[in-house]
Amino acid sequence: MKLKLLLPVAMAALMIQPAYSATEYEFQEMQEKLQNAIIKINAMEQVIKSNADNKSGSVKTKSKKGLTIDTTGGGIKVKSGDQSFAIGGRLMMDYDSMDSNHNSNGKSFDDTEWRRTRINIKGSVNKNWSYKATYDINSEKNASNLDEGYIKYDSKQGLTITAGKTKADMMLEQRTSSKWISTVERGLLNAMNEKVNYLVGKPGDGAGVKLGFYDKDSRISGAFSVFDAYKNDDDDDKSNIWHTTARLTYSPKMNNGFGHFGVTYGVADYKGQETKADIQLGIHQGDKTLLAIESDTGDITNIGVEAAYVNGPFSLQGEYFDNETEKDNGTKGYEWDGYYGQVSYILTGETRGYKWKSGAFDKVKPAGKIGAWELVLRYEDISVDDLSEGTVSANKVDIDRTVLGLNWYATKTVKFMANYSSVSMDNMTNEAGDTDDLDSFQLRAQYTF
């Protein structure tokens, strides 16, 4: 029986002169209480109806004053006019199985790890100013750390200014969030740029400033970044090592899909510090492989090109990078270049999301009850030429890697990934011996909110 059925009885009781002598003030007070009760009953009925219709269990409510509370994304978002506040995050649990050549002790290895356990808060003060702070509560240092934190100004007329710890603008794959990359780990190009040069990704304990621009009509965007990102915590020289990066992207609409084209540039002066080209070969829990080393690094310069095409469930993307390292005295140091190509197809018909302002891929939104299923094939190659010192036979190492992947987007927030990876290397050995063939298998369970 609905609550409203009781209202006529209550109204009738109030209209009849009570047996006791009630003042006019008391009568008016009782009427006001009844009116307030009616308002609350209406609100309760709306919430009950909303929850009954909402099969996902999430809630989205809006008051008459414009305040909305939304939990449909798994987190919580509160919005009132131009002001907003949201809490979100990501949980990624990985399983890695590797053959003996991925480890210096020459033994096969398999293990699990929490790859990322991040929680973030973000919001806006008004239509121009916003902020974000992300903490990794289970970082590699076994302590919570600030993964990202910045304030941002958006003119809404094509100009942005970001100050703090945030990603530098280089590389399509790096700009794409780890939540929405198509393979469990980003590729070898990203590893060389992020772990060796520190020209992509987020700064260590430093920060910087990024100037961005965008034009809606032409779908052209870009950014220029200057930041202190040297990550050698053992360095006694505390002077800043400034990194400068720039990126320009163009995202034209093409028939039923769209294209993506970009160029990037980065430079940094390491002031005689040591740099090492040692990376994990696509497996986060595997040992690093030392490809080259420079004890007195001067300038490091990178230039890259990127392209992608999406049409319905089909997507294609690739990048090429060239790197040159100089010694502090101006002579030539090690250099490397490489590329990758990736093709994916979503068997259930969905399309990969894309944000043209940032020039990056975004989430896949499942359309049916079985979720979205995606097949991925990737091939990449890098060559490292060490002209001075290191562990390289004949001064040159060539690495080829092939990845076959299957992704299941069970819901908008739950994702499962499976990757098989095969790596071949020329002119390279480690403590375990010959590393011509490196095979691995990876699984990931992911929840984002």
Regions flagged by a language model, labelled:
Residues 1-20:
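Gram-negative bacterial Sec-dependent N-terminal signal peptides
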Residues 72-271, 336, 340-367, 374-387:
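Outer membrane beta-barrel
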Residues 3-5, 166, 248, 416, ...:
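Hydrophobic alpha-helical segments, especially transmembrane helices
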Residues 20-90, 219, 352-359:
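N-terminal periplasmic/intermembrane-space "pro-region" immediately following the signal or transit peptide
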Residues 13-16, 40, 111:
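Compositionally biased non-globular segments, especially hydrophobic aliphatic-rich helices
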Residues 24-28, 35, 60-62, 105-106, ...:
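Outer-membrane beta-barrel pore domains
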